């Protein structure tokens, strides 16, 4: 059985992280998002969020969960799995 390999450069959620920040009223700055994630117990910096949004950094599963929680969106929406999912 052949193993399928997927080539993913960067990550699948960068654009959605940026959009999720912009949807907040007022919009969340990268610093604000990093602070929220730090308060949940995970180390995060503005630089990490910037690199995620620019597709320059991979995102681990635990980070995806924390990003979704901090942004108030579903994992499906954040990952672009379900285009119709409510954020």
Regions found by a protein language model. Give the residues of each.
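Short, charged recognition helix plus adjacent turn
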Residues: 2-7, 69, 79-87
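A short, Lys/Arg-rich alpha-helix, primarily the initiator
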Residues: 1-26, 76
């Amino acid at each position: 059985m052949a193993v399928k390999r997927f080539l993913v450069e960067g990550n699948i959620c960068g654009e959605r992280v940026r959009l999720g920040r912009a949807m907040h009223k007022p919009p969340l700055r990268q610093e604000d998002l990093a602070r929220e994630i730090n308060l949940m117990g995970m180390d995060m910096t503005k630089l990490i969020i910037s690199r995620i949004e620019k597709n320059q950094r991979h995102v681990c599963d635990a980070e995806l969960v924390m990003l979704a929680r901090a942004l108030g969106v579903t994992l499906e929406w954040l990952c672009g799995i379900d285009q119709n999912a409510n954020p």
